[in-house]
Each structure stands twice: as structure tokens, then as C-alpha cells.
Curated annotation (Swiss-Prot):
Belongs to the V-ATPase proteolipid subunit family. Keywords: Hydrogen ion transport, Ion transport, Membrane, Transmembrane, Transmembrane helix, Transport, Vacuole. It is found in: Vacuole membrane. Residues 1-12, 77-95, 156-165 are lumenal. Residues 34-55, 118-129 are cytoplasmic. Gene3D superfamilies: lithium bound rotor ring of v- atpase. Its main location: membrane. The record marks 142 as: Essential for proton translocation. Proton-conducting pore forming subunit of the membrane integral V0 complex of vacuolar ATPase. V-ATPase is responsible for acidifying a variety of intracellular compartments in eukaryotic cells. This is V-type proton ATPase 16 kDa proteolipid subunit. One of its GO terms (cellular component) is vacuolar membrane. The chain crosses the membrane at residues 13-33, 56-76, 96-117, 130-155. CDD domains: ATP-synt_Vo_c_ATP6C_rpt1, ATP-synt_Vo_c_ATP6C_rpt2.
């Protein structure tokens, strides 16, 4: 066994688990939001095909959630350096909490965007005045994922601060 690594041997596991959690949970939210609001767009397109391009906004907003998870996963994975002299449990836990914060926020935002997008698109087909209200609610739902992204960046930047050197 090599004596080069001075940190905890289980710490990188938690770091990589955080990267995986960020990507998996965010993409689950993006997939749910895209599917749920896409069903609404498809059913609305039968009645009012001229509104399909206008009603694709919830699908796009849900798809962006996966990018947030990708950003955090890349930040975390670049913070885990196998050639570094140490990677402590504090660092692994910081990366795990970063990934969970971003991933679970993306999952919840995706669920909100999917439900609001589905109902909003169908309602917009019957009453076009509801479009602005739907967009505002979608923006607030997207903000949930942005909060998770910001907290994830802050938490991942905490990794490496446990060293006394």
C-alpha cells in the first residue's frame, strides 16, 4: 500500500457520490418536467396547433435543470485530485452535500415545472391571458433549482478548507 495519500481513503467515495447525486437527481427532475409538460403541449397541440411553439417554454425550462447538475458535477469532479497529498472526509462530505443540494433542488424544481407547465399549457389553449401567469410561476419554480446551484457552488468551494497548511 502506498504512503503517498495522507487523507481518508473513503473520502473520495463521498466526493464522487456527490457528483453523481447532482447529475442524477437534476436529470431526473429535468426528465420529469420535460415529460409532464411535453404531454400537455402534445394534447394542447391537437386543439390549437398555432400555440405549440409558444407553449414549448416549460419544456425548455425543465431541460435546463440537467445543466445545473452537470455544472456542479464537473466542479466536484475537478476538486477531487488523485495526485493531491490529501483529501479528507470534510472535503468528501462538502462535495456530497454540494451534490445533494443541487440535485434535490433540481428534482423538486423539475416536478414543479412539469406540473405547472402541463396545467398552464392546457389552460393557455383555452384562455390566452393565462400565459404570463404561467411564465411567472415557471420562473419561480426555476429559481428553486438556481438556489440549489448557488448553495452547491458555495458548499463545493468549502472543500479543501479543512487543511491546516
Amino acid at each position: 500500500m502506498s504512503t503517498v495519500f495522507n487523507g481518508d481513503e473513503t473520502a473520495p467515495f463521498f466526493g464522487f457520490l456527490g457528483a453523481a447525486a447532482a447529475l442524477v437527481f437534476s436529470c431526473m427532475g429535468a426528465a420529469y418536467g420535460t415529460a409532464k409538460s411535453g404531454v400537455g403541449v402534445a394534447s394542447m397541440g391537437v386543439m390549437r396547433p398555432e400555440l405549440v411553439m409558444k407553449s414549448i417554454v416549460p419544456v425548455v425550462m425543465a431541460g435546463v435543470l440537467g445543466i445545473y447538475g452537470l455544472i456542479i458535477a464537473v466542479i466536484i469532479s475537478t476538486g477531487i485530485n488523485p495526485k493531491a497529498k490529501s483529501y479528507y472526509l470534510f472535503d468528501g462530505y462538502a462535495h456530497l452535500s454540494s451534490g445533494l443540494a443541487c440535485g434535490l433542488a433540481g428534482l423538486s424544481a423539475g416536478m414543479a415545472i412539469g406540473i405547472v407547465g402541463d396545467a398552464g399549457v392546457r389552460a393557455n389553449a383555452q384562455q390566452p391571458k393565462l400565459f404570463v401567469g404561467m411564465i411567472l410561476i415557471l420562473i419561480f419554480a426555476e429559481a428553486l433549482a438556481l438556489y440549489g446551484l448557488i448553495v452547491g457552488i458555495i458548499l463545493s468551494s468549502r472543500a479543501g478548507q479543512s487543511r491546516a497548511d
